[in-house]
C-alpha cells in the first residue's frame, strides 16, 4: 500500500541531503579542473559535489562531468549536476540542481523518477514553497550575503530572509551566496541545513584546506547544538 501524507498525496521519501555542498567551476578560475576541485573538496570534507559549468558546449560539459562522476563514485560522495538533466542521466549522477529558469522541477521529477535528488533555487520564501510543491528535495536559497560569483546577483537576503525561507518549507534549505567560514554559524542558526560554496573553495590557494575549514565550522555548530 502506498504511503500518503496528511493531505492525501503520496508521501515524499526523505533523502539524505549533505550539509557541505561544493560547486566546481572552471569559469572563475582555470588552475584546476572540475575533477581536481572535486577530489580536493572531498578530501577536505565536502559531502556533496555539484558540477557547475555555465559556459562551453554540451560535449565538453559531459566529458568533464564524467571525470567528476568517477571521482565522486570512488569516494562514495553524492554528485549533483547543475541545470542539465541529460548530463545527470548520462553520468548516473545522484541528482540535479535546477535554477528558476531551468527545466521545471515537476517535469524533471517525471523524467528522473522518485529516487534522484532534485534541488531547487529560490531567492524568496514563496519561491522555496513553490519548488517544494513541485517536488524538490532541498532548496538552495540566496544570495544570503553579497557574492562575486554572479554578475547580477539578486538582492541580498541576509540571515533573516534565510530564516523566513527555512520556515516556509519542511525540507532542507542550503544557504548560498557569499558564504564564508565566519558566516557558517549565522546561517545554521537561522535554520539552514547546510551551505553551498563556490568561489571560497574554487579560487582558494588550497581548496582542500578551505573546505576543511568549512567542515570544521559546520561540525562545531552542530556539536554545540547537540550538547
UniProtKB/Swiss-Prot annotation:
InterPro entries (alphabetical): Aldolase_TIM (IPR013785), ThiamineP_synth_sf (IPR036206), ThiamineP_synth_TenI (IPR022998), TMP_synthase (IPR034291)
SUPFAM superfamilies: Thiamin phosphate synthase (SSF51391)
Cofactor or coenzyme needed: Mg(2+)
Catalyzed reaction equations: 2-[(2R,5Z)-2-carboxy-4-methylthiazol-5(2H)-ylidene]ethyl phosphate + 4-amino-2-methyl-5-(diphosphooxymethyl)pyrimidine + 2 H(+) = thiamine phosphate + CO2 + diphosphate; 2-(2-carboxy-4-methylthiazol-5-yl)ethyl phosphate + 4-amino-2-methyl-5-(diphosphooxymethyl)pyrimidine + 2 H(+) = thiamine phosphate + CO2 + diphosphate; 4-methyl-5-(2-phosphooxyethyl)-thiazole + 4-amino-2-methyl-5-(diphosphooxymethyl)pyrimidine + H(+) = thiamine phosphate + diphosphate
Any Pfam family matching the protein: TMP-TENI
Keyword Phosphoprotein: no
Residue sites binding Mg(2+) per the record: 83, 102
GO cellular component: cytoplasm
EC primary class: transferase
GO biological process: thiamine biosynthetic process; thiamine diphosphate biosynthetic process
Annotated EC: 2.5.1.3
Domain of life where this protein originates: Bacteria
Disulfide bridges in this chain: none
Family: Belongs to the thiamine-phosphate synthase family.
Annotated PANTHER family: THIAMINE-PHOSPHATE PYROPHOSPHORYLASE, THIAMINE-PHOSPHATE SYNTHASE
Protein name in UniProt: Thiamine-phosphate synthase
Gene coding for it: thiE
